[in-house]
């Protein structure tokens, strides 16, 4: 697929955690990405692919291979991956070593999207812009974390 279309691969991380008021802890239910895309008024075609909803500290080699497989199979040349920040660089290294002819950026959050003053919306928007700007210049997996 060419043009402006992008694929968003959802893996979980703090980005997608929900605060469970009953248990008083952060859990996973479903991804916040569809709501974020709506709020960000993204006008290009976007395919959202739920890959897994886990904390990146629990991500193992087979989980990373599932992300790589999704990237390999994607028709889109431009991919944004939501990912936990703790092991984002490990996944980025695997994706970069694969040598895919695609622009792949990973983004995460230090504060869940659902929580006030979260960095998730900003980080997603920044990566979308980075993905668009870097599309023709780089075919490596990019990973930047904003603190």
Regions found by a protein language model. Give the residues of each.
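Active-site histidine-anchored catalytic micro-motif
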Residues: 2-147
């Amino acid at each position: 697929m060419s043009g402006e279309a992008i694929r968003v691969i959802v893996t979980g991380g703090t980005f997608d955690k929900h605060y469970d008021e009953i248990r008083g802890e952060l859990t996973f239910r479903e991804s916040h990405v569809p709501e974020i895309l709506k709020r960000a008024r993204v006008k290009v075609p976007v395919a959202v692919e739920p890959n897994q909803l886990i904390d990146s500290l629990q991500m193992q080699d087979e989980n990373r291979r599932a992300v790589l497989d999704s990237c390999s199979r994607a028709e889109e040349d431009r991919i944004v991956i939501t990912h936990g920040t703790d092991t984002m660089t490990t996944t980025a290294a695997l994706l970069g070593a694969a040598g895919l002819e695609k622009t792949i950026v990973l983004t995460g959050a230090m504060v869940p999207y659902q929580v006030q003053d979260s960095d998730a919306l900003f980080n997603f928007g920044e990566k979308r812009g980075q993905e668009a700007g870097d599309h023709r210049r780089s075919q490596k997996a990019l990973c930047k974390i904003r603190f």
